[in-house]
């Protein structure tokens, strides 16, 4: 599989500068993930496709560092960290997408402890085959003989494209065949492969870690979730990069495109479209949405760092809980909003936005996959209203809600009085939404499913409102200190405008969600299947 020629120099440059999967290193001297976040955002803004070649490798190194044996780490990690070898995540199969427990790939024991023979097929494997690295280390889910049904029976295996000898050198081809490359809507240049293992009955792999399945129970899903949790957070950044590029393309275009007269000067000259009211609304809709998502995602990266490195066990547990709650919002809310925000960037371009010569068209296509990767966004909303609402008897989620309440109650200022009042009303509505979900959990589970996505959006909007309003308070303080003539003045003015707009235009959607949930329309459930016509 050949990548675009331009990718090869970029990949080498990233590896030489150690700005790729090297940030996945978890040992002494590691770089905080929150420090890496803006780098990955900029990389994603430059190309949503090429970042996958090192980000998937980073995820694989995370699993091996946490669960691999010392021997496995010594064999694979050095060359994965240098970029000489790539890595992938092999979950999806033709018959096992969101229902991961339906995997049909098999692992058969050999006479060598820890070594298994693999047979099966994986599809939609990002970076599944390419020419940027000399070897690719696949982490494949499969089931051993006697495995339990569903996810409980899944184990995780290290399956290299080319065999790796015990001294870390590369051996012969390991019977992992690329049988197809997908022709995708977006992220062109990122190889999405269908892989067959063991077509010649000669594919082998190591089970990750030392424990074989006990009573048919594997720990592969637990191990893979270490990968997926990080990749879900990264996916939020990938989609944010697309939003960034689309917004700045729209901003640049509206500053030079001259069309129509101002509404306040109908006899005057035609003006740049950035001077028209609705274009300014679209731009601030994008800017505020982009900055809200950035605040949400960067906060989650900080939680992830502190979950590991905070001073006390109690603090580490707290930050781990906060990361767990934020993560589905980072992945799902961000990628849901990406389609809307990049769509607004297209609209700012008018007819030219529909042309492939202009950036927003490809950025829109690129970001669509982010709502599907790492568990579809409905699965993320299920996680949010299910596990995250109730984990540890609901104590962490209640604390999360209380922190937003406390902020709204304690940070009132004259300058932002209207925004704090709107946030207070929004929190009343959000808690009402949470209560309705709790009632449906005990009773009407179909209603809970119908409104899961909107509940997730409601939580994301109030949390982002809190984050942007806290930024606006700081921006107002700095602006008062530095004055309008300071070179950072417009930056701070932009922060204030983003917070005001977001709270008064994005957060207010919560009231519509609350109303719809109270009405409880079930027409989507009641409609006969035959009536979908």
Model-predicted regions and their roles:
Residues 2-13, 19-24, 88-112, 117, ...:
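Flexible, glycine/threonine-enriched loop-and-boundary segments that flank and lead into catalytic domains
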Residues 38, 391, 406-533:
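C-terminal amphipathic alpha-helical interaction region
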Residues 60, 69-72, 76, 81, ...:
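A structural-propensity feature for long, helix-poor, extended segments
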Residues 163-179, 184, 194-231, 251-274, ...:
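A glycine-rich, basic-preceded beta-loop-alpha segment at the flavin cofactor/substrate interface
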Residues 187, 299, 317, 321-402, ...:
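Alpha-helix capping/hinge segments and adjacent helical runs
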């Amino acid at each position: 599989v050949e990548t675009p020629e331009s990718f090869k120099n970029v990949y080498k440059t990233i590896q030489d500068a150690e700005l790729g999967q090297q940030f996945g290193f978890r040992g002494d001297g590691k770089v905080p993930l929150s420090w890496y976040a803006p780098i990955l955002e900029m990389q994603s803004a430059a190309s949503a496709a090429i970042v996958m070649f090192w980000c998937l490798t980073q995820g694989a190194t995370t699993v091996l560092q946490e669960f691999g044996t010392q021997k496995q780490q010594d064999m694979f990690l050095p060359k994965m960290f240098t970029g000489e070898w790539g890595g992938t995540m092999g979950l999806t199969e033709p018959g096992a997408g969101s229902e991961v427990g339906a995997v049909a790939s098999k692992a058969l024991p050999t006479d060598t402890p820890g070594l298994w023979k693999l047979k099966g097929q994986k599809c939609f494997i990002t970076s599944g085959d390419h020419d940027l690295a000399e070897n690719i280390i696949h982490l494949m889910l499969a089931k051993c003989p006697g495995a339990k049904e569903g996810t409980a029976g899944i184990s995780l295996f290290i399956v290299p494209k080319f065999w790796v000898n015990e001294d870390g050198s590369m051996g012969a081809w390991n019977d992992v065949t690329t049988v197809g490359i997908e022709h995708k809507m977006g992220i062109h240049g990122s190889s999405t492969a269908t892989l067959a293992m063991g077509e010649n009955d000669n594919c082998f792999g190591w089970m990750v870690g030392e424990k074989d399945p006990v009573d048919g129970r594997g720990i592969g899903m637990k191990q893979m979730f270490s990968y997926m949790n990080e990749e879900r957070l990264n996916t939020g950044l990938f989609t944010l990069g697309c939003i960034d590029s689309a917004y700045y393309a729209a901003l640049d275009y509206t500053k030079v495109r001259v069309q129509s007269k101002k509404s306040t000067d109908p006899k005057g000259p035609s003006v740049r479209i950035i001077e028209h009211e609705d274009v300014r609304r679209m731009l601030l809709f994008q800017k505020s949405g982009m900055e809200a998502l950035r605040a949400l995602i960067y906060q989650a990266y900080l939680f992830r760092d502190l979950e590991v490195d905070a001073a006390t066990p109690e603090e580490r547990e707290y930050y781990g809980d906060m990361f767990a709650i934020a993560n589905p919002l980072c992945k799902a809310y961000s990628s849901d909003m990406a389609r809307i925000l990049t769509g607004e960037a297209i609209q700012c371009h008018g007819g030219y936005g529909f042309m492939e010569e202009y950036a927003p068209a490809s950025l829109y296509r690129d970001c669509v996959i982010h709502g599907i990767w790492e568990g579809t966004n409905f699965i993320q909303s299920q996680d949010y209203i299910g596990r995250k609402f109730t984990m540890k008897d609901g104590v962490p989620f209640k604390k999360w809600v209380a922190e937003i309440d406390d902020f709204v109650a304690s940070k009132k200022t004259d300058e932002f009085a209207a925004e704090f009042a709107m946030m207070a009303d929004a929190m009343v509505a959000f808690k009402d939404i949470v209560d309705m979900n709790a009632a449906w959990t005990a009773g009407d589970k179909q209603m809970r499913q119908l409104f899961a996505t909107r509940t997730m959006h409601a939580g994301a909007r109030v949390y982002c409102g809190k984050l942007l309003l806290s930024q606006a308070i700081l921006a107002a303080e700095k602006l008062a200190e530095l004055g309008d003539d300071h070179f950072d003045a417009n930056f701070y003015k932009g922060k204030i405008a983003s917070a005001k707009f977001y709270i008064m235009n994005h957060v207010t959607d919560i009231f519509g969600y609350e109303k719809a949930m109270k009405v409880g329309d079930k027409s989507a459930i009641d409609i006969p299947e035959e009536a979908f016509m």
